[in-house]
Structures are given as structure tokens and as C-alpha cells.
């Protein structure tokens, strides 16, 4: 089984923000593969099903970003998945421009509080991360305001393509392994 957790904040006011792009990918996968997110557990909205023959648990932690590790840690411990190969975290990344995707199999939190929480709760940093570029804050701007803001109307078609490509990247990770998916998606610049 794969646990696929998209990071975000649960309040409706955060829908469509840069920080919630992980939730958006989970919604996309749920819709594409007919996996209802109608269950709750592990402090998350959940959906269980299959993606091209692979059993998955889709998660949208409802803990707020900074406590995401509570939800992810509970699910990993319950299902006893191998966090190095069967846990996929989908996150926003301010160090990548919109249209860029990067897959990592380990590393620091890079200033991302949701990832920091997951590392703390798992007791290690070796898990697959699918990082989606949301762009850095404007010069002189506040980082929190930036990640909690929506994308510009001009950028929305690009973000829809990024979400579709992120869904394909998740499938590639499950079918071909993280290394092969990294070779395919890292460095790819998505455009409309």
C-alpha cells in the first residue's frame, strides 16, 4: 500500500492558495481514479482505493500545515508502510518557480514547516517528496502572506497542468520507482 499525503491547510479560506497545492493534487487523484475522500481518520480526510492496480490511501491532513506530521505519522505507524518507498508527500516549494516539479527521496525540511513536522514524527528524513513550485515571495513581501495567497489569474492554467503532471509523477513513482521518476520529472519545465 502507498500512502499519498498532500499538504495544506483545512479551512475553506485556504482553498486555492499556494500552500494548498498538495491538497489540490489529492483532489485531482481522487477525481481521476474515483477514490472518494469521504472518510476521516488519522486527523485527515481519507480515501482508499486503487490507482492502476496499486492500493493507495489518499490523505489531506486536517491538522494545519505545521502539524502535518501528526497525521502522516499515525497513518504510517498504523499501516506499517515502508516510509522510504511507500510514502509520498506532495508539497509546495517556494524555491521552485511555478511550472517546476522536483522529486526528492530524502533531505532537510528546507524551511517547510509541514515537512519539518513529518520529519519529527517519523524520526527521519528519508521519504519521497513531490515538490511543486509556487515561486518565491516578492521582494520585501511577507513569506506567510505569499504562500497563503492564490496564484495570479494568468498562472492558473499553468497550475492546472502542474497538478495533472504531479498526478502522473505519483503514478510514475509507484510504477517505476522514485529514481526513474526523478530522471523523468526533475528539471522538466511545464508550460501551457
List each language-model region with its residue ranges.
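Hydrophobic alpha-helical segments within soluble ligand-binding/sensing domains
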Residues: 111-114
